[in-house]
UniProtKB/Swiss-Prot annotation:
Keywords in alphabetical order: Aminoacyl-tRNA synthetase, ATP-binding, Cytoplasm, Ligase, Magnesium, Metal-binding, Nucleotide-binding, Protein biosynthesis
Cross-referenced Pfam families: Phe_tRNA-synt_N (PF02912), tRNA-synt_2d (PF01409)
Subcellular location as annotated: Cytoplasm
Gene behind the chain: pheS
Similarity comment: family membership: Belongs to the class-II aminoacyl-tRNA synthetase family. Phe-tRNA synthetase alpha subunit type 1 subfamily.
Protein name (Swiss-Prot/TrEMBL): Phenylalanine--tRNA ligase alpha subunit
Record text on cofactor binding: Binds 2 magnesium ions per tetramer.
Organismal lineage: Bacteria, Pseudomonadati, Pseudomonadota, Alphaproteobacteria, Rickettsiales
Length: 349
């Protein structure tokens, strides 16, 4: 009995002084392990009679339970201490400067597109979209292109392997295709713009194989050239934020408009004239191809290159720079996310 009390007291003293879990595990093995002190006491049972074995065995089990409880209590204390130390080590000092966050920016094409759309929205234009891959009817035939028109040639148009109505599919060369689809599927009046990518086999300082267009269409009763001139004039002045900008409409030719015109602008009286867009009254054949009676409805259409307008407004010299991915150039010609116009804000950067 005295030996059991001595073992218990020894265990309490040693475990009380333990400083870490590793040391505690060593004492657990020392007292309760296969060759431990308590296990050694159990070996004495063989030399005792039945009654003594029963009494001694009960005492040994109680000793074992007490030592296990002492170890468990100490283990909980040590685990809490280690957790607190770890939390203290992982503590974040909020006064330390954070890593610099590289914030993205708005590409000038995206910025210019949003500004153009914003201006047209003020004139009541909505937005229509269509597929980039088109068939011959929507891209050429419905728009009054003759079968031998140069625009149909391989050197101007990207043709694909697939076919529709025995004619190859192609990458649309303008977003006028959207106008055809919208007129076929709806009823006049129409007033919308069709922004999107277009594709032509051309590449130099002022042309790229892929570029962005915005084409507009107005179809209604009693529409005339005066309406077209007013919309284009007010649009140009609003986009460039210059009420004194000069415009001139030069006679031109497009298969899908008659009469047709190209619009030139100059910021100041001594500047050279710069061509910025094409426009005209929708050709009666185009209206006929989409099932609209040209004796009842008339309209005008216009088309502009987003990159062209971005170059003029942001003073960018080479069209190819938009697509080169030069980080130095992008850092110079970039816009913050809050610079994108919305219905509540203006256009000034």
């Amino acid at each position: 009995m005295e030996n059991i009390e001595t073992i218990l007291r020894l265990a309490e003293e040693k475990i009380l002084l333990v400083q870490n879990l590793k040391e505690l595990q060593e004492y657990k093995v020392e007292f309760l392990g296969k060759n431990g002190i308590v296990t050694g006491e159990l070996k004495k049972l063989g030399s005792l009679n039945e009654q003594e074995r029963k009494e001694f065995g009960l005492k040994i089990n109680k000793l074992k339970d007490k030592i296990q409880n002492i170890i468990k209590a100490k283990e909980e204390i040590l685990e809490e201490q280690e957790l607190n130390l770890k939390l203290a080590a992982d503590k974040i000092d909020l006064t330390i400067p954070a890593r610099r966050y590289k914030q993205g920016s708005i590409h000038p094409i995206t910025q210019c597109s949003e500004e153009l759309i914003q201006v047209f929205s003020q004139f009541g234009f909505t937005i229509e979209n269509g597929p980039n891959i088109e068939n011959d009817f929507h891209n050429f035939t419905s728009l009054n292109f003759e079968d031998d028109h140069p625009a149909r040639q391989m050197h101007d148009t990207f043709y694909l392997k697939g076919q529709e109505n025995n004619k190859p599919l192609l990458l649309r060369t303008h977003t006028s295709t959207v106008q055809i689809r919208a007129m076929k599927n709806g009823k006049p009046p129409f007033r919308f713009i069709a922004p999107g990518r277009t594709y032509r086999s051309d590449s130099d300082m002022t042309h790229t194989p892929m570029f962005h267009q915005i084409e507009g269409l107005v179809i209604d009763k009693n529409i005339n050239m005066g309406h077209l001139k007013y919309v284009i004039t007010e649009f140009i002045k609003s986009f460039f934020e210059n009420s004194n900008i000069e415009l001139r409409f030069r006679p031109s030719f497009f298969p899908f408009t008659e009469p047709s015109a190209e619009v030139d602008i100059r910021m100041n009286k001594n500047d050279k004239w710069l061509e910025v867009l094409g426009c005209g009254m929708v050709h009666p054949n185009v209206l006929k191809n989409v099932g609209i009676d040209s004796s009842e409805y008339q309209g005008f259409a216009f088309g502009l290159g987003v990159e062209r307008f971005a170059m003029l407004k942001y003073n960018i010299k080479d069209l190819r720079q938009f697509f080169e991915g030069d980080m130095r150039w992008l850092k110079h010609y970039n816009f913050g996310s809050f610079d994108i116009p919305n219905l509540a804000g203006g256009l000034t950067k």
